[in-house]
Amino acid sequence: MKNTNIKSIQLGLALIAAIGMLGSCKKELSVQPSSLSEEKNGNAISASTPISVALNGFGNSLSDSIYVMYSADGELFRDEIPAITLPTAVQQYQTENYQQNDQLSAYTISDKDGNLKSYVSIIRYNERPVALEYNFLGTFKKVLEQREWADLDNEGWHIGGLFEDRDGNNRDVVNLNLLPDEIKNYMTNNYPDDIIVRAFQTKEEAIIVISKNNGGFANVFNKNLELQKHLSICDANCQLEDIEKSNFSTNLLKNLSNTFPNYIFDYADKMNVNGVSMGNLIFINANNTRYAVTVDVNGNILSNKVVF
């Protein structure tokens, strides 16, 4: 009987210790990043508080959400609104540039006196979230940065994460010699005069092939190696010539960072027409969505085309 009582006491102590350890672990895991602390103004919360968006399995991520970042100038606040109340200009922009997108949520950004400053619209495009900011008239301003939970307080990425390519190692580049025969044959049969110059693979296993032929083209093949899009990224008679990012002007770098925060640079070309420089064509990755951005000779953004 004495041994039984001792064993019961030991078991009880072990259970108490285990509960304590679980409580300690839960407390450690529940600590939220500093950027998630909320400052409220009535029903609105601080515009700089990250917005959680469900991933629905994109990129085979272990986490179930990403977080949309908003850098506020001054004291600004965010209110969720019905997406149908977004300006017509916003809805048209998204329909034209993100075909077959699904609207997820929408917000207004206002100052403490309630003056409208901008709109934020979050959509799902190609099974991934895209967050866009527009000014108070509905004109496009920027593609907002996304981060995973673990990266809210660091530089926005970690190896093995959804946004690991922000480390600049260009692991998405495909060796042209290793392009699948199905893609090579398709390009040869359908665009025989095109010269393939680059290729990239997305996290959805799509392959983007960049080709040149009196202009530039982005050819998107899905994971089944079927052509999904053939997009002109440089007008006819436009001759493309490689340019390094190190040759970008300060103004160009600033405009890219302001419009695509924490973007990934893939490559760039000078655009020449009849020997005259028309600016640059820049291919970037913003939150795993690919864009072809054109800028003038002064580094001002002229257009951005959604590639995939």
Regions found by a protein language model. Name each.
Residues Q100-Y134, D193-V220, D266-T294, V307-F308:
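Exposed beta-strand-loop-beta-strand "reactive/processing" segments of non-cytosolic proteins
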Residues P129-R147, G216-C234, T289-V307:
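A short, surface-exposed beta-strand/turn
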Residues Y119, E127-D167, E182:
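Long, acidic/polar, low-complexity amphipathic helices and coiled-coil-like
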Residues G20-S24:
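C-terminal motif of bacterial Sec signal peptides marking the signal peptidase cleavage site
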Residues L86, V90, E148-N177, L231-N262:
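Long, charged/polar, surface-exposed segments that mediate recognition or autoinhibition
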Residues K7-I16:
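Sec-dependent N-terminal signal peptides
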Residues K2-I6, K26-R124, R128-V130, T139, ...:
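Acidic/polar, low-complexity intrinsically disordered N-terminal segments immediately downstream
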Residues G168-Q201, S249:
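Acidic, serine/threonine- and glycine-rich low-complexity intrinsically disordered segments
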